[in-house]
């Protein structure tokens, strides 16, 4: 089974990759390295430095993938007030590009990952 993880250099993506590598899955992934670090990516991962917003590249690299785990997003909720267009492009347009490329390539399953950061601060 070939798993592709977006945001693979971030905390969530890197830990998901480690889990599937231990189960002997083929793991590929992408990250724009804005919030993640290449140091988090295991050497066994086929890594692509690409933004999820790039539909053409996403369509190319998702060929032959069975499952997409979409964990890429800007999670700096406080900063989104200062740069809403950047956040919308990365999080919304990026997600639409990933889903479109996955559908185009007949990926069997898409899993959308989230984190507690989406809920903001506890009041």
Labelled PLM ranges:
Residues 1-123:
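N-terminal Rossmann-like NAD(P)+-binding domain of SDR-like oxidoreductases, especially those catalyzing
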